């Protein structure tokens, strides 16, 4: 069985968020770098830097923690992997779901690279739905 790097990223971010860790380290691939750029641009993470250790590259992510009035620190409410290696989910640009009425984001893998649902609708292209963030 192969590794699902996208699921690994999502799980690492979710676990670090629940444990209130400030930084996490994930393996650096082209897909992970593109997803992290989207998360940085959308404001879910604070900082990203590339780190090399024994000829292997890692991305070190600094999570953005916002304090809720009730007490706990939360960055990302929910992350969910949609398309997976055993069941690929595709959508055209007209049927891309809106998460929380547009408050959440959908990350898609398209023929023009990895992008958010808003960018895909503007360009009029669909693709594989990788994950939801809300």
From Swiss-Prot:
Localization: Plastid, Chloroplast
Keywords: Chloroplast, Plastid, Ribonucleoprotein, Ribosomal protein, RNA-binding, rRNA-binding
Any one of the GO CC terms: chloroplast
Record carries keyword DNA-binding: no
GO BP of this protein: translation
Cited SUPFAM superfamilies: Ribosomal protein S8
Domain of life: Eukaryota
Name of the molecule in the record: Small ribosomal subunit protein uS8c
Function: One of the primary rRNA binding proteins, it binds directly to 16S rRNA central domain where it helps coordinate assembly of the platform of the 30S subunit.
HAMAP family according to UniProt: Ribosomal_uS8_B
Species of origin: Eucalyptus globulus subsp. globulus
Record carries keyword Chloroplast: yes
Main location: plastid
PROSITE patterns per record: RIBOSOMAL_S8
Subunit structure: Part of the 30S ribosomal subunit.
Molecular function via GO: rRNA binding; structural constituent of ribosome
Gene: rps8
UniProt family annotation: Belongs to the universal ribosomal protein uS8 family.
Lineage: Eukaryota, Viridiplantae, Streptophyta, Embryophyta, Tracheophyta
Parts of the chain that traverse the membrane: none
């Amino acid at each position: 069985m192969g590794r699902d790097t996208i699921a690994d990223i999502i799980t690492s971010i979710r676990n670090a968020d629940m444990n209130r860790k400030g930084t996490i380290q994930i393996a650096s691939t082209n897909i992970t770098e593109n997803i992290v750029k989207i998360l940085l641009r959308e404001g879910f993470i604070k900082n990203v830097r590339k780190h090399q250790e024994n000829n292997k590259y890692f991305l070190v992510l600094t999570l953005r923690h916002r304090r809720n009035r009730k007490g706990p620190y939360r960055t990302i409410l929910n992350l969910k992997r949609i398309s997976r290696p055993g069941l690929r989910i595709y959508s055209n640009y007209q049927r891309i779901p809106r998460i929380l009425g547009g408050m959440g984001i959908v990350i898609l893998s398209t023929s023009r690279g990895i992008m958010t649902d808003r960018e895909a609708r503007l360009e009029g292209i669909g693709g594989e739905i990788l994950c939801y963030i809300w």
